[in-house]
């Protein structure tokens, strides 16, 4: 029985490498689109809290989604507060109030104190 003709070998199952830069007809390389995420910041905080602990790419994706979700909720609430008070600028006060409204009890208190500390550090460094 003759064997079927084999085409180019299929990439290995674990291989996730893809062609990043494709050649165009005129010889120029196409620029790879940048994907923004909070992963480097999540990693820095993880190393501050647990220096000997790592994080999987799946867990990093979940953390990135979480940070994006919280950011959108706080920004939306702060925008609503500014609109209610007929203001066109979102200040740290709107952000603080939005955090108090969105986060429960003790978590809101800690978030507000850390935020205040960060704003103070930023203004003193200017």
Curated annotation (Swiss-Prot):
S-adenosyl-L-methionine found in the keyword field: no
Modified residues (N-acetylproline): 2
Name by which UniProt lists this protein: Histone H2B type 2-E
UniProt similarity note: Belongs to the histone H2B family.
GO BP terms in the entry: antibacterial humoral response; antimicrobial humoral immune response mediated by antimicrobial peptide; defense response to Gram-positive bacterium; innate immune response in mucosa; nucleosome assembly
Taxonomic lineage from the root: Eukaryota, Metazoa, Chordata, Craniata, Vertebrata
Record PTM N6-methyllysine, positions in chain: 47, 109
Residue numbers carrying Phosphoserine: 15, 37
InterPro entries: Histone-fold, Histone_H2A/H2B/H3, Histone_H2B, HISTONE_H2B_site
Modification type N6-crotonyllysine: residues: 6, 12-13, 16-17, 21, 24, 35
Annotated positions of the ADP-ribosylserine modification: 7
Modified residue annotations for Omega-N-methylarginine: 87, 93
Chief localization: nucleus
Biased composition (Low complexity): 1-12
Residues with PTM ADP-ribosyl glutamic acid: 3
Crosslink position(s): Glycyl lysine isopeptide (Lys-Gly) (interchain with G-Cter in SUMO2): 6, 21
N6-glutaryllysine: residues carrying this PTM: 17, 35, 44, 47, 109, 117, 121
GO cellular component: cytosol; extracellular exosome; extracellular space; nucleoplasm; nucleosome; nucleus
Gene source species: Homo sapiens
